[in-house]
Amino acid sequence: MNPPSASLVAVVVTHNRLAHLRRTLGRLLDSGPDMLTAVLVVDNASSDGTGDWLAEPEDPRLEVVTSPRNLGGAGGFELAMREAVARFDPDWILLMDDDGRPEPGALAVFHAGDRSGWDAWAAAVRHPDGRICDINRPSINPFWNRAAFLRTLRGGGREGFHLGPADYEGTALRAVDGVSFVGLFLSRAAVLRAGYPDGRLFVYGDDVLYTLHLRRLGGRIAFDPALRFEHDFSTIQAHERRFRLLWKSYYHHRNLLIVYRAAAGWLFWPALLAVLPKWLLKIRHHGGERRVFLRLITRAIRDGLAQRLDATHEEILALARTGSEPGPVEEGSKSGPEKG
């Protein structure tokens, strides 16, 4: 069991999704101060009335940091964690998007459990209808785990190194390596060890890179199926292969190369021979925009291999422009194709 005085601060990153944010903050603040010390929201330059709504807090535990520009999810989480540590120095930080929230009672379960011996805890994240949320499934690095490597090599794909239904329905803890920032409980020791996410990533991959970094430094991360979260994430269909906002393809592929290098070590270069042809075949799913998609993915591969993170978001939006006006920037939506 956590010490009775263990402090927990939730951080939420939001951008133009006020309806989701209202539900998430309502759920969080339903927990008393003994369960939740504070909630810190980073408003990523929202233009939908979020700032006005947050300016009238109904709970003194709610604190708001407003960014004058959109930092993306990665920049938002870096800022949120830095501010949470500076303002509260909590025992635990709980991370989530504006559309992710603990199920009722989840924080009580966290405090009631023995959390010693682990630096971070990953929740079991489901859709509101109870289905496992695939994008939030914790993973085991197959390059560090022989059994996971062999399962993946034998055609298991993502199933070879991600937790599955049996892990979610059981009661046993599982040691994991890669975790999303929806329902991740980070201890003070974890932050002292691993520091903060790299905001230059902008969107995609910052969570997996951060948790892999924590593991590489000796931190321990446990998946606890009793810690239940919901992710009201419905903008993607399982069969989808096309980026609806083309600029996201740049960040997805650039950052994935950086994740692969961090996970694979010296095996990164042989693995690349299998990865790159698969990526280039995605061009066929972008009829009418193939030239733009190819331009973005070529730049992504170049920057990812060089581990360059200095491209501005304005540059990437310019690369993604076609003859039509570019769509809105919606970092929080995570709309896009399946991972990989």
Q: What do the predicted segments below correspond to?
A:
Residues D89-D99:
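Short beta-strand-to-loop acidic/aromatic patch adjacent to the donor-nucleotide binding site
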Residues N141-D177:
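Short, flexible, basic/aromatic active-site loop/helix in glycosyltransferases
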Residues W247-K248, H252, G265-G340:
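Non-catalytic, C-terminal membrane-associated alpha-helical segments of glycosyltransferases
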Residues D43-D52, R69, G100-R101:
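A conserved acidic beta->alpha catalytic loop
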Residues R17-G32:
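Short, well-formed alpha-helical segments that are part of the catalytic scaffolds
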Residues G105-N141:
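Conserved donor NDP-sugar-binding/catalytic core segment of glycosyltransferases
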Residues G178-V179, G183-G195, R200-L227:
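A short, conserved alpha-helix in the catalytic core of glycosyltransferases
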Residues S67-R87:
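Glycine-rich, basic loop-to-helix element that forms the pyrophosphate-binding segment
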